[in-house]
From Swiss-Prot:
Compartments, as annotated in UniProt: Cytoplasm
Entry superkingdom: Bacteria
Molecular functions per Gene Ontology: protein domain specific binding
Pfam families xref list: CheW (PF01584)
Organism: Thermotoga maritima (strain ATCC 43589 / DSM 3109 / JCM 10099 / NBRC 100826 / MSB8)
Keyword Cytoplasm on entry: yes
Domain CheW-like: 10-147
One Gene Ontology biological process: chemotaxis
Cross-referenced InterPro entries: CheW (IPR039315), CheW-like_dom_sf (IPR036061), CheW-lke_dom (IPR002545)
GO cellular component term of the entry, any: cytosol
Gene3D superfamilies xref list: CheA-289, Domain 4, SH3 Domains
Protein name: Chemotaxis protein CheW
Keyword Transcription regulation tagged: no
Length: 151
């Protein structure tokens, strides 16, 4: 039987892949996951901005998460958009595919820095089912992409 302390040490993440690299976001910031649809390009936008989508009357910028993280990707494999919100900013992250929601305990989380490559964009590594998942800090990523010029 779980104690209250055990329950407090659990949290959920949405896991997904880019170029066979497993990554995850906190589910608290995820609004929905949709299939990649028609993305309207925006002239003179930043290199990681793929364009915008109209989602039920809301215009949402879509960014290529692989470009933000500096990892390889195959544009043909990018089939899903993770729509996320922090504070008043709503962004769609283009990824290969969503794997699902995982319930994680604190003892599965390695808070050591993943690498200099991800810096503050990563909260650490999640160890689950013999696989390592890079646990991303969605707040830091959205802050980084909106702080200078906006998406």
């Amino acid at each position: 039987m779980k104690t209250l302390a055990d329950a407090l040490k659990e949290f959920e993440v949405l896991s997904f892949e880019i170029d066979e690299q497993a990554l995850a976001f906190d589910v608290d910031n995820i609004e929905m996951v949709i299939e990649k649809s028609d993305i309207t390009p925006v002239p003179k936008s930043r290199h990681f901005v793929e364009g915008v989508i109209n989602l039920r009357g809301r215009i949402i910028p879509v960014v290529n998460l692989a470009k933000i993280l500096g990892i390889s990707f195959d544009e043909q494999k990018m089939k899903s958009i993770i729509v996320a919100r922090t504070k008043d900013v709503e962004v769609g992250f283009l990824v290969d595919r969503v794997l699902g929601v995982l319930r994680i305990t604190e003892n599965q989380l390695d808070l050591t820095n993943v690498s200099d490559k991800f810096g503050k964009k990563s909260k650490g590594l999640v160890k689950t089912d013999g696989r390592l998942i890079i646990y991303l800090d969605i707040d830091k990523i959205i802050e980084e992409i909106t702080v200078k010029e906006g998406v």
